[in-house]
Amino acid sequence: MVKSSGHARIGVISDTHGHLDPQVLEEFAGVDHIIHAGDVMDGTTLEALTAIAPVTAVAGNMDEGKLGKLPREVAGKVGGVRFIVGHKRKRLLKRLAAGKIDGVGRHDSPDLVVCGHDHLPAVEWVDGTLFLNPGSASAPHYEDDDPTIAIVETGPVGLGVRFVRVPRRADDEG
């Protein structure tokens, strides 16, 4: 588990599907970095997020055109946290195990692995690595669930995650 003498906040979002509620921008205000795990579907979403903090984004299965040309997986580091992001967890883990992600060796262990795709918020610790799916920021998997995003915070005790519910799309009410 990564421990940092400093403090960093990372906004994590996925599956916006062309909708970015203003509350997301409020929740991400002051973060050091934003990770978008795919299915962006609208370039203005990334523009709005980039106005808040640097953004690492990957293509999802619904992204086309310019967004479809985003990488499928990305490795990076922010605030001492080594992360890998990809849209589909199964594909990401296969490519990670095979050493096929640029900048990541076969035996490297990231601190944080972020995926999206299934629209279900989830957090799991495996051998000191935090696996995180922030859920969908626009279209939750189950009808009675709320859209969600996540905030990852680093500090002297390691990584912590907080899920944040955001409003449903107006066209998804009811």
Predicted regions and their residues:
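Conserved beta-sheet core of the metallophosphoesterase superfamily
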Residues: 56, 93-162
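Helix-adjacent hinge/juxtasegments
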Residues: 56-99, 103-104, 109
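Residue-level detector of flexible, active-site-proximal loop/helix-junction positions
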Residues: 17, 62, 138, 156, ...
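Short, solvent-exposed aromatic-acidic interface loops
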Residues: 161-173
